[in-house]
Regions:
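Conserved metal-binding segment of the jelly-roll/cupin
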Residues: 57, 111-146
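Short, conserved secondary-structure segments in the cores of folded domains
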Residues: 52, 72-73, 110, 118
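Double-stranded beta-helix
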Residues: 81-121, 131-181
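A short beta-loop-beta micro-motif enriched in histidine and acidic residues
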Residues: 41-50, 61-73, 77-78
Length: 181
């Protein structure tokens, strides 16, 4: 109904995003996101930052991936604990991983447990994966980063995709950001 608004939302990838990374098992490997703010990468007249809300199910994994452009902070806002693992395999940088202002000595040794209120800074180029810790419930997470482009700045270690194929078996109640014309 509002083409200019729809174009603004789509260009900035604002709104709902639900993915199973093309793997077909959302409960085990999936993520629900809502992009609240986002600029356009490379556009100096645009916001230089992005903010997303992430809803991570208990045991639900976001597979290993890295970003060439953005550095991001992952902040656990509530619910259970978030487990974050790092891998040198597929990484194209080796920056310092920082939890609440303290550098992690060897982030690749074992997953980091983030409790509500804690955060981790993930440098660009570092492969990372996260999931809700088993037995602790679903996790409400915020991501604050440089302007984000999910179409071009996600590099999955295992060659999977970022977006799901949606089976449109009924009319949508809420549009995903990439459903807007």
């Amino acid at each position: 109904r509002e083409p200019a608004l729809a174009a603004h939302l789509r260009e900035r990838q604002l709104g709902w995003d639900v993915t199973d990374f093309g793997l077909g098992d959302f409960a085990r490997q999936g993520l629900t996101l809502f992009c609240v703010r986002n600029g356009k990468q490379g556009d100096p007249s645009s916001l230089p930052y992005a903010e997303k809300l992430l809803f991570v199910g208990e045991g639900q994994v976001t597979p290993f991936h890295a970003h060439k452009v953005k550095t991001e902070d992952i902040i656990v806002r509530g619910g259970g604990n978030l487990m974050v693992a790092f891998s040198r395999d597929g990484s194209f940088a080796d920056g310092a991983v920082v939890v609440d202002g303290r550098a992690v000595a060897d982030p690749y040794a074992q997953p980091i447990r983030l409790r509500p209120g804690q955060s981790v800074t993930i440098p660009r180029g570092v492969q990372h994966s996260f999931w809700g810790e088993e037995g602790q419930g679903d996790v409400f997470v915020a991501e604050v980063s440089q302007a984000n482009d999910d179409l071009t700045d996600n590099y999955f270690r295992d060659g999977i995709g970022r977006f799901a194929q949606v089976d449109e078996d009924e009319p949508p109640h809420r549009l995903l950001w990439n459903d807007r014309a």
